[in-house]
A protein has these predicted regions:
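Conserved GNAT acetyl-CoA-binding A-motif
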Residues: 97, 104-117
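Conserved N-terminal entry element of GNAT/NAT acetyltransferase domains
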Residues: 1-17, 150
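Conserved active-site alpha-helix within GNAT-family acetyltransferase domains
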Residues: 118-140
């Protein structure tokens, strides 16, 4: 299934190049950029578990970002959301979230949740997400959610 918004598409990795880009963006942006070298494991079994949907944000032949959408009943969990560094601060994070929400809606999801980096909380708030609990605002990875319209 392919979801499009403007010139961007959300697609499941298919080729070796797709998977390489998917894992490379996650490793560099979510781990190494935060000083965690040698920690990322591209072969985690949950990556391809039932209900888990790795996705790439692409525009033409450019790999822009990644997210894994885990669907469990009427809730989807956005995991490891990242925009590659050259494409940051261009509105693509908002595009990625909007496409992930369209994906979730197509899978009968009514609520999207994500554990986000503390410095990303203001961005998620601007995108309509709410903190699960007020005490979560000070957590290392606050839990946030958004109710989707039917």
């Amino acid at each position: 299934m392919r979801f499009e918004l403007g010139r961007c598409s959300l697609v499941e990795p298919q080729s070796d190049a797709d998977w390489s880009a998917y894992h490379d963006i996650r490793r560099r942006i979510l781990f190494e950029r935060r000083g965690e070298y040698g920690v990322y494991d591209a072969n985690r079994p949950d990556e391809r578990a039932p209900g888990h949907h790795p996705q790439l944000l692409v525009r033409a032949s450019d790999y822009l970002g990644v997210v894994r959408i885990d669907v469990a009943g009427t809730t989807a969990y956005l995991r490891r959301v990242a925009i590659d560094e050259p494409y940051q601060r261009q509105g693509l994070g908002r595009t990625l979230l909007a496409l992930a929400e369209l994906f979730a809606h197509a899978h009968s999801v009514t609520r999207v949740e994500s554990s986000v980096a503390r410095d990303a909380v203001p961005f998620y708030l601007k995108c309509g997400y709410k903190l699960v609990g007020v005490e979560d605002a000070d957590a290392l990875h606050p839990q946030m959610y958004k109710e989707l319209r039917p």
